Amino acid sequence: LVVRREALALYEDCKAAKSVRITAVGKRTEEIGAPALYNLAELQKDANRYHSLTAIQVQEIAQGLYEKKLISYPRTSSRLLPKDVYDTLPPVMEKMLSRKEFRQYADTVDLAAPRDSIEAQDTMEHHAIIITGTQPGKLDREEMLVYTLIVGRMLETFMPPCKVEYTTVDAVCAARKFRIRTYRILEKGWLGIFEREH
């Protein structure tokens, strides 16, 4: 209640002042790189965040997709790929980009550029979760949600960075100092895959 009263008093003071003096404006641009490929923990986190699936559900769904030969081994903690697996990706990515929901990104995905998602060593026990390129048959709703997350993350990983402009405005009103922060996306880059906020 005290905070509410103070806020209302501040609002009335500023309303009475009828003017605001801008004392400083600052801008900066930042590039936000694409996220790494999924391991099981990150897949569970995103599936819960965006689709309200539990960790157990995601683990079981991912295991089912693996048994259908649609994705690589899911119970992994790695978010990297060994070079020999990376070298098999171009035809897999082509199949992904032929899907209507991702076709528009065909000219943006760049497999040639070195990425942090590649590991120099030739072998590793279980690499990051990727799709195999086998076309999915009939999947139920939850299977398709998890499968689409994995497809989308693979595309995101090989997309350009997201470019964001941050603006800070310092102002004075009714003898009170205010700082306002906002941002706008200049280039969506990888963030455009699922059209999410950064």
Residue ranges, per PLM feature:
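Core catalytic DNA strand-manipulation module of type IA topoisomerases
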Residues: 1-198
